[in-house]
Amino acid sequence: MSEPKPTQPIKEIDEETKRKNEEKKKAKEAEKAEKLAKMKEKEAKQAAAKEKELQNKLKKEQEKKEKEAEEKEKQEAEEKIVREHIEKILKTPKGEKKDVSSLLSSYHPTAVESIWYDYWLDNGYFSPEKQMEIQPHVVKDKKFVIVIPPPNVTGSLHLGHALTNSIQDAVVRYHRMKGEVCLWVPGTDHAGIATQVVVEKKIWKENKITRHDLGREGFIKKVWEWKGEYGARIQGQLKKMGSSVDWSREVFTMDDQRSKAVNTAFIRMFNDGLIVRTTRLVNWSCALKTAISDIEVDFIDLEKHTKMSVPGHQGQYDFGVLFEFAYQVEGSGEELVVATTRIETMLADTAIAIHPDDTRYTHLHGKFAIHPLNGRKIPIITDSVLVDKDFGTGVVKITPSHDPNDYETALRHGLEFINLFTDEGLINENGGERFAGMKRFDARNAVVEALKEKNLFKGMKDNKMRLGLCSRSKDVIEPMIKPQWYVKCDDMAARAVKAVRDGDLKITPKTHEVTWYRWLEGIKDWCVSRQLWWGHRIPAYHCIIKGVKSNPYDTNQWVVGANQEEATQNAIEKFKLSSKDDILSLEQDPDVLDTWFSSGLFPFSVMGWPEQTQDMQDYYPTSLLETGSDILFFWVARMVMMGQQLTGKLPFEQVFLHAMVRDSHGRKMSKSLGNVIDPNDVIKGISLDELIAKLYEGNLDSKEIEKATSGVKSDFPTGIAECGTDAMRFALCAYTSQGRDINLDIQRVVGYRNFCNKIWNATRFAHMKLGDSFKPESFDASKLLQQSNAINLWILNAAQRAITLSEEGFKEYDFSKVTTAIYSFWLNEMCDVYLEMTKSIFSLEEDSPIKQKTKETLYTCIDIGLRLLHPFMPYLTEELYQSLPRRPEDVIPTIMLCPYPQSQSCWANSDIEEEMKQCQDIIKSIRSLRATYTIPASKKLHTYLHVKNQENLERFTKNSSFIRVLAYASELEVSISDESRPGCIVNVVNENVSTLLDVRGSVDFNLEIARLETKKQQLVKNYETLVSKTTIPSYDKVPQNIRDDNTQKIKALDEEINITNKTIESFTKLNI
């Protein structure tokens, strides 16, 4: 048993514990103090960082403010220079050239487009007489003549008109430059129904009066006032767009000479038996109380039962449904159920039709039915044309006076015609006492109720249908039987068809010929009378003679004449009267002619027809009719028919139809959508607020304004930037691709404004490099090639290609082809390549032969480029052309009369083109690498070209200076190699060439290694997929060309994988 250990005194233990606790406490306090110090240090650092960040932010904001202030100051200074420049040029005396001795530092449309139109106009350059006087290369017996599709005087021109005029002016300017004697005749159209409607809306909106309050004479006076205002506005717009029309020959379709032509045409065609008065079914607008043409009917598609409002009515009505009701067969309890979309017309039913082969109704042949609401006995007829026995009940109601199909059926069976409506669309006395005086769609509801009372209404169901609306009033079109004047079209249409089939008249695009044949071979007589006040009053007089019963529906009781006296004399001769006293009454028809009648005479009436004027002899027939494809039948066909009938000649040799302009969403332009664009707003620019304010200037109602405002805000949130006339014209022509509608995006027009700036700067560059003393030599195409260098030969080859493509495009009416060729020449070849390459040449001594040769080449290409561009951009090209020095032989005072560039076959050089293309591919490859790694152009990098053979080594070594400049390289080494280089990124141009950039110090290599690994995975995947295709058993059956192509692709992928691996290895070694 061990001895017990001596115990430590309690006091000592307590002291030790206390000491240890104190040490722990101190340690904790020290640790806490240290943490607190660290925290304070961290907070101090954070505070310092925040302070630094704040200071940096403040510094950046200050720098931004200073930069903005500097830019604003610079912009204001530039704007001041531009304002002063414009003020100076606006002082140019009318008709004199603008001073272009100093060009602004950048392109400004307003400055460029000032003065030149007055210069052209006042010097008579638009007239063929002046052209023949001063154009040295004019060919006087070769003419090019077009007439403008006359815009309606209903309002301002829109972008559709701008497209038409841009195309026409481009074509006219091209032919004028080619030395053909050019005449482009301007004019406006009175647009009967359209103009009457807008003026009626205007006087109601302003004074709450109708045309009937003013009377015919007073209202016509108001319309002439409107024509004066808007005719002048249209003329101003055409001038602003640069249209080179001969204003000395301007016409209006209701001026004295055109009115004489209309009267003469009507009288001749009446006397020839081509115009007759008869009662037929027409499109009737109850709101306007007139017949309207097919083109003035808009159709909407209804998929199912739809409630709709109708002008002049309260509430909404049922459309898109079939109403079913029953007729009772006379003398029996049998019912025949019929279905109709227009149940109100049953009040004027005069028959029920069944199919002759329908055995269900054989027993009813020759029987009658009793009208359920008026008790009238109506026949049950058999008709295999109208009735489809398998549709519905196989029974059809017949309303001859209010349905086209029923009308034709009634003519076949000799049925009674009962007119149900007044001109205003009210039910007349034929509808019965219960319904007379009702509005037609109120009658729809009332008829349903009346049938329900008799238990004869069987219900209604959804029915897909097309509903015709008046384009002017939006009222539902009512087919109505009305006495009207008609032109017999069969023979004229047959001649028009033959003209196209025989190739005497060409239609471009050719696809429209199908429409031409379909319309004209199925043509019906043309209703030419309108129940309006504004228009050419019909020169026909109803004659009531002693002893003869009056019948205004009988054509034989009508005579024609240019005035009352002539009509009286014609009546005496026609009816073999002893004197005018035998005429009890001779009253002129109050109706006016369809606008298309006078428009149909336009190509020859503008030349002075019916007189045989000098213009008729010199300029008719015209060369081309250019217009929208939507009026091929309504205008073009009628001009052809009337031209052949009245002059014995086709009015033009060729028709070119452009597509329709729509908004960027592909929607038809409509004021109520707010997407109708005024060309002036594109030319000058306009703010959003101003765009919205313009909506209130028209005749839109409050709901339409609200809808249009929403559309404007959506499409133009910041308004429309100033683009200028030239950019707008070029954009519109560039959009034209035959047969396709144009979905116009204003941003594309802005892009072409920037293109104008490129051309401006290119010409300013030429001025600086040519020098004030430069005088170009007489033009000698072959001499330019002598002792020149590759870049000069290349740009001449590019010019030759642009000329060739432009000529082809104009001949084919492929304006997109022309604009693309010109755009590519100026931007891709002149600006992006040639001008950059000439900088080193222009740094040589002044007497250097290659420098002088380059000056001549540069001048030649600028001159050619401006002439090619002139038909599309007349203002910019005139300004820059006038700023250039002249060759000794160039004495023409304006670019518009200069010769269009001629093809120079000696400049065509396929070898130099291919060589430069390969160089450009290399440049694109290098630039692509730089863009991928976000390396700015200002950062010059050592660059390598690895090639596979001696031929490529020599080719690219020879062009290395050219490549180096455009690839932003500090040095360019060309060698035969397939090795990677330290610190280099690689791009494979093709199987023969790779580009390498030394990016050490410019790129984060760790980031790039990760990117390259991802790239390699995709390359390997593509490689394995392609290889697996070649291992299938049936691969030998694959066509040889495809197998060869696969072999090349596999080889290229393998090579790119190897290069990528080497690059990853190189980057890894750098360990950066």
UniProtKB/Swiss-Prot annotation:
Residues 16-79 have a biased composition (Basic and acidic residues). The keyword DNA repair does not apply. A motif ('HIGH' region) lies at residues 151-161. It comes from Dictyostelium discoideum. Residues 1-79 are annotated as: Disordered. It is found in: Cytoplasm. This is Probable valine--tRNA ligase, cytoplasmic. The keyword ATP-binding applies. Its EC number is 6.1.1.9. The gene is valS1. It catalyses: tRNA(Val) + L-valine + ATP = L-valyl-tRNA(Val) + AMP + diphosphate. A motif ('KMSKS' region) lies at residues 668-672. NCBIfam families: PRK05729.1, valS. It is an enzyme of class 6 (ligase). HAMAP family: Val_tRNA_synth_type1. One of its GO terms (molecular function) is ATP binding. InterPro entries: aa-tRNA-synth_I_CS, aa-tRNA-synth_Ia, Anticodon_Ia_Val, M/V/L/I-tRNA-synth_anticd-bd, Rossmann-like_a/b/a_fold, tRNAsynth_Ia_anticodon-bd, Val/Leu/Ile-tRNA-synth_edit, Valyl-tRNA_ligase. Residues 10-90, 1003-1069 form a coiled coil. ATP binds at K671.
